[in-house]
């Protein structure tokens, strides 16, 4: 059983999927599985998923004949996940190469039940914009309820998993 399941919903992602997959292949932490859910893509995304899976036994691909949306794709991934922990990655995003290792080690050292991190936007002009709704730190249940519920949920009842 892998330590971490990474679920990637894929739809019409041919132009940028290679960067996402490369970021997984180059992770310094190796005890992961990658679940690619091709959600009815009509571009070359499905073939890229299959090619990547053929090279790495940790990768599983699920193809849907028609698009059902990102939530259903993630739910399919959740149903298939075998990891002790689960994370999501969008097909047009990528991880830093040490991301999973860093999160895993911090979680192991602290005994935490979950780990989270910020993100960096790569802007069209090549600049980067770091974003984080969560201050760095290790939190107990009470602190999570007090400090993190607002940033995680925001002022809305529904907040994107990642945006």
Sequence positions of predicted segments:
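Nucleotide-sugar donor-binding/catalytic module of glycosyltransferases
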Residues: 1-163
